[in-house]
From Swiss-Prot:
Single GO BP term: maturation of SSU-rRNA from tricistronic rRNA transcript (SSU-rRNA, 5.8S rRNA, LSU-rRNA)
Example of a GO cellular component annotation carried by this entry: nucleolus
Name assigned to this protein: U3 small nucleolar RNA-associated protein 25
Residue runs in coiled coils: none
Organism: Eremothecium gossypii (strain ATCC 10895 / CBS 109.51 / FGSC 9923 / NRRL Y-1056) (Yeast)
Functional summary from the UniProt entry: DEAD-box RNA helicase-like protein required for pre-18S rRNA processing, specifically at sites A0, A1, and A2.
Main location: nucleus
Residues annotated as signal peptide: none
Bias-annotated ranges (Basic and acidic residues): 30-45
GO molecular function: rRNA binding; U3 snoRNA binding
Disulphide bridges, residue numbers: none
Keywords, ordered alphabetically: Nucleus, Ribonucleoprotein, Ribosome biogenesis, rRNA processing
Region annotated Disordered, chain positions: 1-143
UniProt-annotated location(s): Nucleus, Nucleolus
C-alpha cells in the first residue's frame, strides 16, 4: 500500500488470492535457493563479477520501468547475493523477502509488484550493508545529537519522567528570550518541582556544527571546503532545537517563509533516516562477527518520520525538497507521483494573496504516500511497513487508522515514528481537527501484530511503551491557535524539551493599525465563570442571546445588511436554531455545507435587503472568500482565527460605503470575546492592547 485513494480498497477474496500467489512464489524462491547452493563452488571473484554485471544491468533501465525484465533482474540480483552468503544468512534473507511480499499483498498491492519489490529490497539491503560498512570512516561526533537523544539517556531517568507525566507531577524548566518581534520560550520537563531553575537553551551553532551524514554534506554544500551558507533569522531560531530533537511550535511570519523552515526539516529528516539505517546495517555486520553483542538500534517497524500536510500541492513541495536534498538521482515512480500530485493551476487573481497561496496547485486532501530510501534509489509509493518516511493528509491517514471495516484498520506502521511534522497547521485546522487528534491517539503505540522485527535489537523504551518521550514533534503554522497550544501541551512529552515562538504584534502592525478605514469597532467582553474552556461556548451563547439579539431587534442603526460571522460550526447551528425558534428576526444563512442554489439565493436576498441578517461561517469564508454585497454592519460572534478575515469583513462595509449603500458614520463592527480569545485579539488590535482588552476593568472597548 503506497497511496490510498477511492480505488485503493480491496475485497477479502482478492487479498486471499494474492496471499496464495505469494505462497506459490515462496516455494519458487526455495527452488531458486537450491539452484543457488549449487553455485557456491564458484570463486568469490566470479560472484563479485556477477554482482557487478547485475548492477550494470539495473543501471541501464529507467527507474519507472516495470515488467518481466525488471523482475528477472531482481531474481538475478538475489541469486548472486545468495551465492556469496552462508546458509543461515541466505535463509534469513529469503524468509524476510517472503514476509515483505505477503505483507504488501495483504495491504492491497499487485502480487507481481509485491514480489518484485520484496526481492529488490533483499538485494538492495545487502548492497546498502556493504556501502554502510564502507562509510565506517564517517566518525560520529562526540556531540552527535542523534546518539545523545536516543541512546544516552539512562533507563532510570526515562522511567522517572514517564511516571511523572502519567501522574501529573511533571513540570517544566522555562527560559524566555526576546528576538526582535518575537519571543522564544524554551522549556524542558523535569520529574518534580526540584530543579526547575537553571539554563534550558543549548548555545547556538551553525549547520556545520551538527553531525550530518557526509553524503548529505557533500550534496548540499555543507563540507568544510564549501562557502558557509548564511541562515535566515527564522532558520537561526529553528536550527538548534530542530537538530537537538526538541519539540517545536513555530509561528512563521509570512507565506513566503515556508521554504526556509522546510529546507531545514527535510534535511533533518533525511539525516535521521540515513543515520538510523546506516547504524542498523553496521550493527548487522558487527553481529556477524560477534553474535553475543547486545545492540539496541531498532523500533517495532521501519517508518521513522511522519509529515502531515493539508493538500497534495504542499506534499509535492515537501517530497520535492526531500528528493533534491537526498543526493539520490534514481527515483522510482517519479512521473506517477508528479501526475498525481502536481498541478500548475492557480486560483483567480481577484482572490486575496493568502488564498492564492493556500489553494494553489492540487488541493486534494486525501492521500498517504510512503517513501523508502536506499543508498542508490528512492522508492515512492512504497508499502507503509517498508517505508522510511510517510507523507500524508489527516483525512488520508484517518481512513486507514480508523477504517469502518475493523479488519482493514492499520496503525502499527506508526508505532516507531521518531520525527513528526505538522506543516501548515492553520490550513489543517479548517479541514477536521479531530483527524489530527486521532493521529496522536494512534502514534507510538505498541503494535497489535508481530511484524518482521528482531526483538533482541528493539530499544527498551519502545518495549516499555515510552516512545512518546523520544518522539520529536514539529508544528509550523501561520497563526498559533488554542488547538496548536493544546497539541504541544497535552500530546507531546519529549524528554529533550520544547521550543515555542510567540510573535509580538505592535499596534502599528495590527489589523486595526493597518486598516485605513475609519469605522466604529466595538469589542465586548463576557466573563467565563470558573474559567473552564468547556463551559466557554455556553457563556458566549448566553451573552449573545441576552445582550446582542435584543440590540439587533431594537437597533438604532441599520435595520438590514447585518452580517453575523460565526467561526465554529457548532455555534452556528445553535445560533441559527435560536433565531429561528425564539425570535422574529428575518434572517438567512450560508455555510460550508450549503448547496450552490442556497448560496446564490441567500446572498442575493441579503444584497436586496429582503433578509435582515445573514449568518456566515468562517470555514465557508476560508474556502470561498465570497465578495458579499450589501453589508452595512458586522457582528463577530467570536474573533476570527485568521486576522486577514477581520480585515476582509470590514472591507465589505467599505465597499458598501463606496457604492453609496452604507454610511461609515452609522455602520458598526461588534466583536464578542472572552479572555480565552487573547491569541486572536493580539493579531487584530496588537499585543499590548489585547492585554488591556482581556484584563482591563472595562468590558467594552471602542476603536475608530
Amino acid at each position: 500500500m503506497g497511496i490510498t485513494d477511492s480505488h485503493g480498497i480491496m475485497d477479502g477474496k482478492r487479498g486471499r488470492k494474492q496471499l496464495r500467489n505469494i505462497t506459490r512464489i515462496g516455494r519458487a524462491i526455495h527452488v531458486q535457493e537450491d539452484e543457488a547452493k549449487s553455485r557456491e563452488e564458484h570463486t568469490v571473484e566470479e560472484a563479485q563479477a556477477g554482482e557487478q554485471t547485475s548492477n550494470r544491468k539495473r543501471g541501464n533501465h529507467p527507474a519507472e520501468d516495470d515488467g518481466g525484465a525488471r523482475e528477472s533482474q531482481s531474481y538475478g540480483a538475489l541469486l548472486t547475493l545468495l551465492s556469496a552468503e552462508h546458509g543461515k544468512q541466505r535463509k534469513k534473507r529469503l524468509r524476510k523477502a517472503e514476509a515483505e511480499a505477503a505483507e504488501a499483498a495483504e495491504a492491497g498491492e499487485d502480487p507481481e509488484e509485491a514480489i518484485t519489490a520484496a526481492l529488490e529490497n533483499s538485494a538492495q539491503d545487502a548492497e546498502d550493508a556493504e556501502d554502510a560498512f564502507d562509510d565506517s570512516g564517517e566518525s560520529d561526533e562526540e556531540q552527535d545529537h542523534f546518539d545523545v537523544h536516543f541512546n544516552r539517556v539512562s533507563a532510570a531517568d526515562v522511567a522517572q519522567l514517564d511516571a511523572a507525566f502519567k501522574n501529573g507531577r511533571a513540570q517544566y524548566r522555562v527560559q524566555k528570550e526576546a528576538r526582535g518581534e518575537e519571543e522564544i520560550l524554551y522549556s524542558k520537563p523535569v520529574a518534580s518541582s526540584e530543579g526547575t531553575e537553571g539554563p534550558v537553551r543549548v548555545p547556538a551553532r551553525s549547520l556545520r556544527g551538527y553531525a550530518i551524514k557526509q553524503r548529505l554534506r557533500m550534496h548540499n554544500g555543507l563540507t568544510a571546503d564549501d562557502p558557509e551558507k548564511p541562515l535566515t533569522p527564522q532558520q537561526k531560531v529553528l536550527l538548534d532545537p530542530m537538530f537537538q530533537y526538541q519539540d517545536i511550535l513555530y509561528e512563521y511570519e509570512g507565506y513566503d517563509r515556508e521554504r526556509e523552515y522546510r529546507e531545514l526539516y527535510t534535511l533533518h529528516i533525511l539525516n535521521h533516516v540515513y543515520k538510523t539505517r546506516d547504524r542498523i546495517l553496521k550493527n548487522n555486520q558487527k553481529l556477524q562477527d560477534n553474535p553475543d553483542q547486545e545492540l539496541l538500534d531498532q523500533g517495532f517497524t521501519r517508518p521513522k518520520a511522519l509529515v502531515v500536510v493539508p493538500t497534495r500541492a504542499t506534499a509535492y513541495d515537501v517530497v520535492d525538497l526531500l528528493l533534491q536534498q537526498s543526493g539520490i538521482e534514481q527515483v522510482d515512480k517519479k512521473s506517477k507521483f508528479k501526475d498525481q500530485f502536481y498541478d500548475p493551476s492557480l486560483p483567480p487573481a481577484s482572490k486575496p494573496k493568502s488564498f492564492q497561496h493556500v489553494f494553489k496547485g492540487n488541493t486534494n486532501d486525501f492521500f498517504v504516500l510512503g517513501m523508502k530510501f536506499t543508498r542508490k534509489a528512492i522508492r515512492l509509493y512504497s508499502n507503509f511497513y517498508q517505508s522510511d518516511v510517510i507523507v500524508c493528509s489527516p483525512l488520508g491517514l484517518q481512513l486507514i487508522i480508523e477504517n469502518t471495516d475493523k479488519k482493514k484498520r492499520q496503525d502499527d506502521f506508526l508505532s516507531s515514528i521518531e520525527v513528526m511534522v505538522l506543516d501548515q497547521l492553520h490550513s489543517i485546522e479548517f479541514q477536521n481537527i479531530a483527524h489530527v487528534s486521532n493521529i496522536f491517539a494512534h502514534i507510538n503505540k505498541i503494535p497489535q501484530q508481530q511484524r518482521d522485527a528482531d526483538f533482541s535489537r528493539i530499544r527498551m523504551w519502545y518495549i516499555e511503551d515510552q516512545a512518546k518521550l523520544f518522539r520529536q514533534t514539529m508544528v509550523f503554522t501561520r497563526y498559533i491557535s488554542p488547538f496548536a497550544n493544546a497539541l504541544l501541551n497535552r500530546k507531546c512529552a519529549n524528554w529533550a524539551g520544547r521550543v515555542k515562538s510567540h510573535r509580538v504584534v505592535s499596534a502599528e502592525k495590527s489589523v486595526i493599525g493597518q486598516l485605513g478605514l475609519k469605522l466604529r469597532q466595538i469589542f465586548q467582553r463576557f466573563e467565563v465563570l470558573g474559567g473552564s474552556t468547556v463551559d466557554e461556548p455556553d457563556f458566549r451563547f448566553k451573552f449573545f442571546t441576552s445582550v446582542v439579539v435584543p440590540g439587533i431587534e431594537k437597533t438604532t442603526g441599520y435595520d438590514s445588511g447585518i452580517l453575523l460571522y460565526i467561526p465554529e460550526y457548532t455555534d452556528f447551528i445553535r445560533v441559527r436554531n435560536y433565531l429561528k425558534d425564539k425570535t422574529r428576526i428575518l434572517f438567512g444563512d450560508i455555510n460550508e455545507y450549503s448547496d450552490q442554489r442556497q448560496l446564490t439565493s441567500n446572498r442575493a436576498l441579503f444584497q436586496l435587503g429582503r433578509i435582515k441578517v445573514l449568518l456566515y461561517t468562517e470555514r465557508l469564508h476560508h474556502f470561498r472568500r465570497f465578495e458579499l454585497k450589501g453589508v452595512k454592519s458586522v457582528i463577530l460572534y467570536k474573533p476570527p482565527s485568521n486576522p486577514e478575515f477581520y480585515q476582509e469583513l470590514l472591507r465589505y462595509i467599505g465597499k458598501s460605503a463606496f457604492l453609496g449603500v452604507a454610511d461609515l458614520n452609522i455602520a458598526t463592527v461588534r466583536c464578542l470575546y472572552s479572555k480565552m480569545d487573547s491569541l486572536a485579539l493580539e493579531r487584530i488590535v496588537g499585543t499590548k492592547r489585547a492585554a488591556v482588552l482581556t484584563h482591563g476593568q472595562n468590558e467594552v472597548y471602542e476603536f475608530k
